[in-house]
Amino acid sequence: MAINPRISEQYRYGSTLDRISNVKSIADDINETAISGRKLKKISDDPVATIRVLRNRTRITNLDQYRKSLDFGRGFLAKTEDALTSISESLIRAKELSIQQSNNIYDEPSRKAVAEELRQIINHVIILGNTTYSDKYVFGGFQTTQPPVSPDGHYLGDDGFIFVQIDEDSFRPININGRTVFDVPGGEEGKRPPLVNILENMYSSLFTWDRDKLHESMVDLDSAMNSVITATASLGARRVALEDVSERLDRGESQLHSDNNNLEGADMVKSALDLKRAENALNFTLQASSKMLTPSLLEFLK
């Protein structure tokens, strides 16, 4: 059975066109890789690598959220620590004044002048007790929207702890129990006298010159100072821990970006060589096909 010359000619043209189209497609793909600098442009390029890249991107997004929580926690801790440091300095000054006056060598005008300085210290401690960070009261526990220390010095907060998420299934507390600072352990009959009340007792004992009451207040003040020191130390340890977490998150994100660059990024030297080979292959294919194609069709394909 004879082969139809027209069919044979059509098959020859079709095969040539397919061959040129395939070579040109490869060259275009390599050229796009060289221009974009990325070797993963669609999932079919490397399904396993693409899935890994997507997982890394999700992890990076999560790390960004954890870092925001971490930054908030660090700021909250720093503001609380600054307030405690100022409270500690105020209590040290109050202790110095009470020691001076307890020697009974000062006259009444001097004692009243010292009492007025104590009044300023009391007001300052109340202000510090109502310190806020990002519109949240740092000493109130869960009660972050209302002042935890009343004008008369009573603690109005609760014993709740505020946690921030710093990683998957990992949470850290960023506040202290304000009651441990503003309701002082010990005191008469095991009660917890409010910190401000201790200072108020010192103030009134100087005005009325009640040495016994002044000495009792000094004992309570020592307990208050120890409570503030303990709270400050615990905050310092938490702050250092969060700094360590921050560094770990930075390292983790850097590794994820590096991994994605290795998976997605094209080797530019290799891409340049591949592009040159593809161009040569295309030129060779066009030259080899020119004998089988009419000049007009060949020009159209170029």
Q: Where are the regions that the model predicts?
A:
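Cysteine-poor, low-complexity segments in flexible/peripheral regions
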Residues: 147-208
